[in-house]
Structures are given as C-alpha cells and as structure tokens.
Amino acid sequence: MGKDSQHYYGKHGTPQKYDPTFKGPIYNRGCTDIICCVLLFLAIVGYVAVGIIAWTHGDPRKVIYPTDSRGEFCGQKGTKNADKPFLFYFNIVKCASPLVLLEFHCPTPQICVKQCPDRYLTFLSARNSRDFDYYKQFCVPGFKNNKGVAEVLRDGECPAVIIPSKPLAQRCFPAIHASKGVLMVGNETTYEDGHGTRKNVTDLVEGAKKANKVLEARQLAMQIFEDYTVSWYWIVIGLVIAMLLSLMFIVLLRFLAGVMVWVMIVMVILVLGYGIFHCYAEYSRLRGEAGSDVSLVDLGFQTDLRVYLHLRQTWMAFMIILSILEVVIILLLIFLRKRILIAIALIKEASRAVGHVMCSMLYPLVTFFLLCLCIAYWASTSVFLSTSNVAVYKIVDDTPCPLLGKTCNPETFPLNESRQCPNGRCQFAFYGGESTYHRALLGLQIFNAFMFFWLANFVLALGQVTLAGAFASYYWAMRKPDDMPAFPLFSAFGRALRYHTGSLAFGSLILAIVQIIRVMLEYLDQRLKAAQNKFAKFLMVCLKCCFWCLEKFIKFLNRNAYIMIAIYGTNFCTSARNAFFLLMRNIIRVAVLDKVTDFLFLLGKLLIVGSVGILAFFFFTHRIRIVQDTAPPLNYYWVPILTVIIGSYLIAHGFFSVYGMCVDTLFLCFLEDLERNDGSAERPYFMSSTLKKLLNKTNKKVAES
C-alpha cells in the first residue's frame, strides 16, 4: 500500500509540506514572466498603431451608403449627391453575372438619382421627344446630347432603357408584380432592351435576385435595428430586473444557502414544466388550423421567423427539447442528492467569504467595463480596416479587349487606353488598393482579432487573480475575519498588476493562440462546405473537436494556475504545474464537489434567465393585460426577447462568476490545507468549523481546550 501511494504521488508530484511561516497569500514576492510582460506591452503599442492607421484611412460611411460607378456616395450630406439618395443600375440584367457574388458589384454603370424611374422609356424613343428631359436625369452627370446613339450607349453615358422601379435599401429595383400568375413590369410582360430586342420580364427577375441577395440581409438588419430603437428602454428595464434578481438571489444565498438551493432546484423544474405546458397548449390550439401541419423541412428557411410559430411541428420540437431537459435535470438530482448536501456546505462557506469581501460583488462591473473597451476598440478597428480601401477602377468592355480587367484612372482613361480598347469603360469596381498597406489588410484583420482575444483573456485573468487573492486571504486567516487584511480585494488587485502582469499575459496568450486557431478552422470549414471531399470534412471536424477540448482544458488549467499565482506569487508554468498535480492528487473530490457546485450555479442562472425571459415574452407579445398597450409594436418580437435573455444570462453569469471563483479558490486552499496540516497543535487546520465538521476533521488544540 505504501509503495502504491508513493508511486501515485510520484506520478502527480509530492504533497505540500508544512511551512510554519506560511499564513496565506505571500506579500513579499517578485515579478514573474517579465518577458511576456514586455511582449504584451509591445503588442499593445503595435495594436494602437494599427488602430491609428486604420482610423486614418478608413471611412465607415462606405458600410452605410451606396456608391456610384465613380465611388461617390449617394445621399450623403456634404457631397454633390446629397440630394440623390438612390442608386440606379443602367442594366439590372447584368447583375445576374457571377461577378456580383465575387466582387459585390454589378458590371454595369451605376449613378445616384433623386428618384427611381416610374415609367417605361427607351433612349432611342425618348431622345427626340419631350420625354428626354425626364430621361436625362438617369444619364451620367453633365451628359451632353451631342453624340450618336451608338456612341452614347457604348460610352455608358445613358441607359438603353428605363423601366418602372421601386427603391429598396436605397437602390432602384424593377417594380415587378404578378397578375394572374404572369410576371409583369408596369403593364408589360416583356420589355425592349434599347437595342431593338424584346426580352422577357424573367430576365429582370434573375438580375434583381442576385443584386438583392445581400440587400435582403440588410433589410432584415434594418428591421431589427428599428425594433431596437422602439424597445431599447424596455430591454434596459428587463436587464435591470435581471440584475436585481441576481443581487436578491445572492443576498438570500448569503443567509439561506441551503433553502435557496432547493428552492432554486424546484423553481427550475417548475419553469421547465410550465414551458412544456405552454408548448403543448400552443400545439393543441393550432390543431385544425390551415397550414399548421406543414413540416419545417417543407417550409425551409424564412426571414420572418414568426411564420414558424404558426406550425404545430415547431411547438412539438420545443416541447420535446424542454421535456428532455426536465428529465435530465430530475435524474441528475436523484443520483447526486447526497453530493448536493456537500455542495451546499461549500456554497455556505463561500457566502461567508463573500460577506466579508462584499466589494467583490462589484468587481464584475470592472471586468465588464474593460471588456467593453476591448470589444469597442476591436469592432471600430475592424470596421475602419474593412473600409480603409480606396476606390479601384477597372476597364470593362462588352467585347474582348487586351486590357480587360486592368486597373485604370478615370481621369486619364480615354487618353491612354482608347486605342487598345475603343469600346472600353473605366468603371468603379471595388474598394481595394495595390499599396503595401492594402495588401496587408487581411493580416491586419487577423492581428486585430488575435489582439482582441489576448486582451479579453487578460482582462478575465486579471479578475480571476484578483478575486482569488481576496478569497485566499479569507481562507488562510486563522481567526476569520480578524486576521484578514483591511482591503483584501484592492491588495490582491495591486499585487496582480504590480508583480504578475507577465504571468497573466502568458496564460492569456496561450489561450488566445488556441482561440484564433479555432476561428481560422471555422473559416476554413465554411469554405469547405461546398466541397465533396469527405476526408477533408472529417479531418476538419476532428480538428475543431480537438481544439475545442484543448481550449476548455487550458481555461480550466489557467483558472487554477491563477489561484496559485495569487497565493504563492510563482510564475505561470510553476503555478500551472502545482495546481494540476494538486488537483490530480484529489481528482475524485474535484469531480464530485467542484462540478456539482458548478451545476448548482448553472441552475441559478437558468432560473434567473427563465424568469426574465418568460416575463419578456408575455410583455412583448402583448399578453399582459395591464400593460398590453404599453408594449411597442415590433417587426420581430423575438429581437428584444432574445436580447433580454442573452443580457440576463451575461448579468447572472457575472454575479455567479464571483461565487464560482470563491468556491474554486476555497476548494484549492482546502486541498492545500489538508496536505500541509494535520490538525495538531503545531499544524492546525485553517478551514472553518463548518468544513471541519463536514469532513470529520478537528484541531487538537481546540479539542483540548
């Protein structure tokens, strides 16, 4: 038995030895992982430089406003097209070209106009009639009618034909409608293309479809934005309710941990039960209604998600999912009922620790603020990088041309290239560039994403070390709370920044590398979806699974390494090794106690999110009679509901993360305490009387007195 024990400890390190001078987090410590600290500083300097360069070259207006063939904005104040908000395509049929999907523009001249055409005219018929004054507004600015028809159409100065159109997302699209199953534009089923040929309206449909693909997503985004503008204050109220519920729950947990845990468990079961009942009620209500028996597969994807709520199969799917969750939770509670009692004792001890360090409940606000800064800087830099390209002009021609697709200058184009491409046009193609900066844009975007992951993980690591240091000072105080420092949270925060910035940078760097690899794998997966190579797909799934597991393991290891850093002040690698071996020597306790506690915290989050989500659902669907006239009219009521649910989860997660870090810290300290001490007068346990009673441990000195 002794040999087995010696072999086990040799494989997972040796237990901590008794140190009479150890009284908790070490104050006399030195800087750790200085190289990583310097590396982080240089990376931040580079990141700021990238942001400045992006902000210098970028123009976010390119995301909002359409541009004509010259790259000039339509409807933008302060430009010559300020009174021309709509983009008009000379030949919408050419938008059916695959070039639209590759370079996101139609290979046809485009100009900004005050209004979309409301009548059918050809250039040939309008040129020598009184309709030409109307027609001329759809020609290029400054057009002079001093050329022949063929030259005008060749040079792309006027469209060959205009047809009745309607604006959509500031673009003019043919006003196509169906009459008795026949597609028509205006009152015609065919149209003349301006060259003496009549074409079917379906050609216009194909062109409009390709040009409209991106615009459908934009229209959906605009409708969602409209919903936010009329419901944002109600969303804020819902998030405030979630915050108050989280605070109330934690305050009650401080005094009534055992009762609250069981109440929480029952409430989650009841909430899921109500969800099952509601789904069944909707499923029964739709029985016999026209169209309610259509399957989800037959319906396909619809941008208006409310359509799915009129299908019985949707509510059946919801009911099955909720029923599975209900059964799984009940089974887990049955098999883990004894372990729940142990977890409750840990939560009570954590409640006492949080009670003595109450300012720790406000620390998630610091983390949230710093994360918002990281997200804002990353998002703005990303937008400016993506819009920092310059207008690139390409030579286009309807006939073969040796310079076709070459870059050109619209100011000098007719002089230099007219001999080789007599029918060519220098047309705006896309926003890009041929400078070193423009060629490096993809790399800068990757660097931007990588720095976001690194800084975000650093902020989270700083919070974990700070909380761990504060709660460790509580555990290692022999007389709680008399032996605790005056300001444990601020002391831990100062130690983390002063001594361990390098270690935090090291741990967050490792995690950021794994996360950026996962992002690249997701990108490659999207590119390979159309491929038929099954081996490549299988390999991609395996890689994604492996890196997902690796990220979870690194997060777990980092979390415990940060606790050891907060206590002992050792570097990252030493702390990670010691934490890992300590957990491996107590793997059963880790699996049972720590994970059961995490499960209980998850139930608490579900209770808060479920309660606020149900309240938001009834409010935004006008089902609360008292305030049904107060709820705003919406395009998609699920927009504010999902926002409230996600926001409530993040708020609850922020508050429960403090408790979770407290439990993890106390648990690790508890394992150290068991290895360092034996309860004798010389080596007394630091754990509280509750934990000693729970584990049948006593301090002999206390027993003798």
From Swiss-Prot:
It is a multi-pass membrane protein. Residues 55-232, 278-315, 386-453, 525-562, 620-637 are extracellular. Residues 1-33, 254-256, 337-364, 477-503, 584-598, 659-705 are cytoplasmic. GO terms for molecular function: antiporter activity; choline transmembrane transporter activity; ethanolamine transmembrane transporter activity; transmembrane transporter activity. Glycans are attached at residues 187, 200, 416. The keyword Transmembrane applies. N-glycosylated. The chain crosses the membrane at residues 34-54, 233-253, 257-277, 316-336, 365-385, 454-476, 504-524, 563-583, 599-619, 638-658. Signal peptide: none annotated. Its main location: membrane. One of its GO terms (biological process) is choline transport. The modification Phosphothreonine is found at residue 14. It comes from the Eukaryota. GO terms for cellular component: membrane; mitochondrial outer membrane; mitochondrion; plasma membrane. It catalyses: choline(out) + n H(+)(in) = choline(in) + n H(+)(out); ethanolamine(out) + n H(+)(in) = ethanolamine(in) + n H(+)(out). It is found in: Cell membrane; Mitochondrion outer membrane. Keywords: Antiport, Cell membrane, Glycoprotein, Membrane, Mitochondrion, Mitochondrion outer membrane, Phosphoprotein, Transmembrane, Transmembrane helix, Transport. Exhibits choline transporter activity, as choline/H+ antiporter. Also acts as a low-affinity ethanolamine/H+ antiporter, regulating the supply of extracellular ethanolamine (Etn) for the CDP-Etn pathway, redistribute intracellular Etn and balance the CDP-Cho and CDP-Etn arms of the Kennedy pathway. PANTHER family: CHOLINE TRANSPORTER-LIKE (SLC FAMILY 44) (PTHR12385), CHOLINE TRANSPORTER-LIKE PROTEIN 2 (PTHR12385:SF34). Belongs to the CTL (choline transporter-like) family. Interacts with COCH. This is Choline transporter-like protein 2. The lineage of its organism: Eukaryota, Metazoa, Chordata, Craniata, Vertebrata. The gene is Slc44a2.
